[in-house]
């Protein structure tokens, strides 16, 4: 009996049947999991510029697309709502001299990307109504009397923001965000007082007429 077992094993080993059986049982569907040669191209017409793919990509292979060339749908809404005519329609650029950073164009833009086009201040911004001229920041770039930051002297170290006890200094990005109106719809009683004091309300009435 033992002789027959040894001979049977030699036959299997010599013919490679064991390996063949393993391949046929476990590796039959291997081709189904093969890596595709190329990634499916991005459908720019369907992209809303949310940036989620950029956040989750483990190899940082995806980058935010160019604003004017691919994402903007050229709807012109931002041009229509700008109270100071600061947005030029031919290339959807923003005139930094006219832009008051009111954020109205951001509220109306169906694809929330124009916010990146709003001109940002070159230095942190001091909120004068909060600043008490404490002088804790020893940086020569800060004018304590006028509560302003000299862009030529500021090194953007942001140490002034960390030291300010009243949180009266904002980064350029924080400053832009603070200008955009946010309404708590649960707390709003629809008194419309905000409309009465809004400085650009007259411009909207002029556009509607």
From Swiss-Prot:
A Pfam family of the record is Fer4
Designated name of the protein: Uncharacterized polyferredoxin-like protein MJ0934
Q: Which InterPro entries match?
A: 4Fe4S_Fe-S-bd, 4Fe4S_Fe_S_CS, Fe-S_Ferredoxin
Q: Does the keyword ATP-binding apply?
A: no
Which keywords annotate this record? 4Fe-4S, Electron transport, Iron, Iron-sulfur, Metal-binding, Repeat, Transport
Stretch forming the signal peptide: none
Residue numbers binding [4Fe-4S] cluster: 47, 50, 53, 57, 72, 75, 78, 82, 99, 102, 105, 109, 154, 157, 160, 164, 188, 191, 194, 198
According to its UniProt entry, this protein's organism is Methanocaldococcus jannaschii (strain ATCC 43067 / DSM 2661 / JAL-1 / JCM 10045 / NBRC 100440) (Methanococcus jannaschii)
Q: Which domain of life is it from?
A: Archaea
